[in-house]
Amino acid sequence: MSKIYTKAQFWKCALQVNPASYLAYRGQEQSLTEDEYNRLPLQACKDENIKVLDIADHGNVDGIDAIRNVMNPEGILVFPGFEIATTEKAHFVCLFSENTSKDQLNRYLGAL
């Protein structure tokens, strides 16, 4: 998305997409490889003309780079992030700029 837009522009988005590792958070085992899993949301994005998605897992950012490497070459912008929960069981999805590195996300998580 390197074009400069001078008027309102809307993109179809998929928000809070979970990475392959999400099932481990739920205590389940993933039957697909990470690459196989990442190709499923890629195909869904292509089928539905989705141009933007965010990737968020519970306190884990390990799957960010792998899904970016699949989505970005196809012109799909990925906002990386993570989900956190409070002691009151409120959940927050924290999203960051598309250029935020996995290391920076880990620093944010470590500061919480």
What kind of feature is each model-predicted range?
Residues 13-15, 53-55, 78-82:
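Hydrophobic faces of well-ordered beta-strands that scaffold small-molecule active sites
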Residues 11-22, 58:
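Histidine-centered catalytic micro-motifs
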Residues 9-11, 28-30, 38-45, 60, ...:
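Extended charged low-complexity segments that act as oligomerization/scaffolding linkers
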Residues 1-2, 42:
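Generic recognition of flexible, low-complexity loop/linker segments
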Residues 19-35:
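Acidic/histidine-rich helix-loop elements
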Residues 23-25, 64, 90:
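Active-site-proximal flexible loops/turns
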Residues 41-58, 83:
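Divalent metal-dependent hydrolysis catalytic cores, especially in the metallo-beta-lactamase
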Residues 2-4, 10, 66-112:
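Extended substrate/RNA-proximal surfaces in nucleic-acid metabolism proteins
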